[in-house]
Amino acid sequence: MGILKRNPFGHILFLKKMLIRYLGIMSHRRYRGFNQLHIEGSEIIKNLPDQKVLFVSNHQTYYADVVAMFHVFNASLSGRLDSIKNVGYLWNPKLNIYYVAAKETMSDGLLPKILAYAGSVSIERTWRESGKDVNRQVKFSDISNIGKALDDGWVITFPQGTTKPFRPMRKGTAFIIKKYKPIVVPIVIDGFRRSFDKKGLMI
């Protein structure tokens, strides 16, 4: 891999690798020390194709959910079944993992911007922004970027579009599935609200 090779969004892959390693090492103890992440069903990860996979998950924190998935996916690909023991699996992380996130969330501070570079497909929410209700049309460029990410690799999406419990699923995920026809893998997250703050930055 050339040191200046870029992904379809223009991000330098070498820099992305360094950021994923750093974030993984810094966050690992939160899932294997202060908390104990319990994983089930990760055996399917290793058999998935390299592109066009959509993970559909509930959402409990802004960031801890996604970071945990980066750990689990990379650990599973390196042969660790339902375990993230020994952070060495991040030495050669999968670089084509993306996640759908609100643009306002990923531009609010240095750490969110670093997390965005690591894999965010940032979109404008159509119903809410900065804590206020809005009503606007879907940006076709946002849909196109999600399709671009699927063509390149794996995408994580949160169809509720919020960390609040029991919210209905937004229609966007169904549209993405119908349009791009990815392999769909459901994920259930539980207990993160009790273990982390809302943003998933504090224990």
Regions found by a protein language model. Name each.
Residues 38-41, 107, 139-143, 169-173:
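Amphipathic coiled-coil/heptad-repeat helices and related helical stalk/stem segments
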Residues 121-166:
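Internal catalytic-core helix/loop-beta-alpha segment
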Residues 49-133:
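Catalytic core of membrane glycerolipid acyltransferases/transacylases, capturing the structured
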Residues 27-60, 70:
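Helix-to-loop junction immediately C-terminal to a conserved catalytic motif
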Residues 16, 29-36, 100, 131-137, ...:
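Short, flexible loop segments at the rims of nucleotide/cofactor-binding pockets, characterized by
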Residues 151-156, 161-203:
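A cross-family acyltransferase "interaction/gating" segment
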Residues 47, 114-115, 149, 176:
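Structural alpha-helical scaffold elements that stabilize or flank donor/cofactor-binding regions
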Residues 1-40, 68, 109-118:
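A transmembrane-helix-recognition feature enriched in membrane-embedded lipid enzymes
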